[in-house]
A protein has these predicted regions:
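A conserved beta-strand-loop-helix scaffold within acyl/acetyltransferase catalytic domains
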Residues: 46-125, 232-312
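Conserved N-terminal entry element of GNAT/NAT acetyltransferase domains
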Residues: 26-50, 212-238
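Active-site/acyl-donor-binding loops of N-acyltransferases
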Residues: 32-37, 75, 81, 150-215, ...
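Conserved acetyl-CoA-binding loop-helix of GNAT-fold acetyltransferases
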Residues: 127-145, 153, 318-330
Length: 396
């Protein structure tokens, strides 16, 4: 067990150990046993070490994936409140001392019905073409963790989803729509980027009129928040700890990722450091009633900049999202960002009514595997899920 297990909240696995639906497949000491027969070119599998950084970044770059700096990469674990030394950093596949495969492993903390759910999210799964037939060994190692109650994959492509499900993973039965809502905040720049790209039909740009920016501002005026005051925060303070204690009680019946001050500060540390993060909240007196966090992303080919909603939480029946998005749209326009987007989460009907966004189809998938029968039974119910880009590694 992790060293700090005695001071942790009650663990789901501790209360339901007898309900485990399978035996752990392979421990970290026997990962090599599932590899191919040994030969000069047969891959070897082992746990990731921090010293693997250069090899992993080279591999990720070959596959067009993001390559963070070494300090940012290490911070995924060393700055993570949920990380212990017993938690694997991930697994690598190597041939002749060259890394040809990688599967990252990020520990996360969740709660459900007052019990701690120890989760892990996959990250950065990449395997060189010549060794794709061994890809499932990396996923197998991820599934074989013995100190984890819930395994998540929120960024899988179609092939990755098929592989995840082939080993027992399933899509979360959430009610997330397969479309995003967005507002154009720099109509001229938005159109120019698309017209510069070869093969983009002109009519696809005309769907989003040049007058969109003026239209957005008009909708903002129509959606005046009245007495609801939305503020912008420079970071996460003690109000977020108090808010989290209230939120976890109100949403006991929902699988909820930890959102205390320390965890939020870790999750958004580098986004804040690079001025790519906006934190908005509704405050009454000294208390936080709702908050939303947006980050900035850029399309690699187009250069299109988006401000996207990552996390939104609200107490009781308060519905401030329309007012928050209105302020986000203003900030995006001032920052020269092309669009504001809400995707991968439930969108309040009030937002669509008051702010009249454009929409586009997307692929929003949250895959999971719960080894313990009791937790698996609970998570089979749609009401247990309320996912967003905060979950898994979607915004790390």
């Amino acid at each position: 067990m992790p060293r700090n297990a005695s001071v942790r909240a009650r663990s789901f696995a501790a209360d339901h150990r007898s309900g485990c639906s399978h035996q752990t497949l392979h421990t970290k000491k026997t990962i090599n046993a599932v590899a191919a027969p040994r030969s000069n070119s047969a891959p070897r599998f082992r746990e990731t070490e921090f010293a693997d950084y250069a090899g992993i970044m080279s591999l990720l770059a070959r596959h067009g994936l993001s390559t963070p700096g070494i300090e940012q990469w290490k911070y995924l674990w060393l700055g993570n409140p949920s990380y212990t030394r017993q938690c694997p950093l991930g697994w690598v596949m190597e041939v002749d001392d060259k890394l040809v495969g990688y599967f990252g492993n990020i520990p996360l903390a969740y709660e459900l019905e007052g019990q701690q759910v120890r989760a892990a999210s996959g990250r950065g799964w990449a395997v060189d073409q010549d060794y794709r037939s061994f890809s499932l060994y990396l996923l197998h190692a991820f599934f074989s963790q013995s100190e984890t109650d819930l395994l998540l994959n929120t960024t899988a492509n179609v092939r990755g989803e098929a592989a995840f499900c082939s080993l027992g993973g399933v899509p979360a039965p959430n009610e997330i729509t397969q479309e995003s809502a967005f507002w154009i905040t720099d109509a001229t720049g938005f159109s120019e980027l698309f017209l510069r790209r070869k093969g983009v039909p002109f009519h696809s740009v005309l769907k989003y009129p040049v007058a969109a920016a003026a239209s957005v501002l008009q909708h903002i005026r129509q959606a005046a928040p009245g007495k609801m005051q939305v503020e912008r925060f420079a970071g996460f303070d003690e109000k977020f700890d108090r808010f989290w204690n209230k939120l976890r009680n109100e949403k006991r019946a929902v699988l909820l990722g930890r959102r205390d001050r320390a965890t939020l500060a870790w999750h958004f540390h580098y986004a804040l450091k690079k001025n790519n993060c906006w934190i908005f909240g509704v405050v009454q007196g000294r208390e936080l009633l709702a908050y939303a966090v947006f980050d900035r992303t850029q399309h690699r080919e187009l250069g299109l900049q988006r401000m996207r909603l990552v996390d939104y939480q609200s107490l009781a029946d308060l519905q401030p999202l329309a007012a928050i998005i209105s302020l986000a749209i203003r900030c995006a326009k001032e920052a020269g960002i092309h669009m504001v987007e809400v995707a991968g989460c439930r969108i309040e009907a009030r937002v669509k009514k008051e702010l009249a966004p454009f929409t586009r189809p997307i692929r929003a998938t949250c895959l999971y595997r719960a080894p313990h029968r009791a937790l698996a039974a609970q998570l089979a119910t749609p009401a247990r899920w309320d996912t967003s880009l905060y979950d898994g590694d979607s915004s790390l």
